[in-house]
Amino acid sequence: MANITAMALTPSKQLDASFALPDFALPDVVSGKTTIPADFAGSKALAVVFLCRHCPYVVHVMPTLLALAHEYLDAGAAFVGISANDAANYPDDSPQRLKDMVVSRRIPFPVLYDESQDTARAFHAACTPEFYVFDPERRLAYHGRFDASTPGNNVPCTGHDLRAALDAVLTGQPAPEPQHPSMGCNIKWK
């Protein structure tokens, strides 16, 4: 396991209840195809996950996130991952290395690369992993953590908080409160 003490633990920022899905046009690291929000039209919920390869907090949640994504994709939700880390200084987060991760882990949703970091700024993203759930009108319903588990705290990784938010949005209910901030490695800004 990576040395967690060497990582800068960063919380996500609180967003206003009126926050709506920002527009973006980013390349899929596997296909190279430009992905835009309209590609997820028709989904009952959209989960956006800021992630990377090297952060131990992302590595910690990834197996459970993949299982949860498979379950909720079948229920009508859509997922998209976005990596915005500066690949020049963090080559493990380059598009090619992200592609290797997507293929080897069989990630069931597109992972996009935000080279300019403009999309991360539009989302007010601060850390990896960081989770957003948008309703069918693409209004923010949830912004926060995956669950209470972190590397080394011995709390089982279940995806409880993200799961509760997705369940609420898929049934037309408001997401549960309180929404706890995500905690992870800071986005590696240029």
Residue ranges of each PLM-predicted region?
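Chalcogenol-based redox active-site neighborhoods
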Residues: 2-179, 186-190
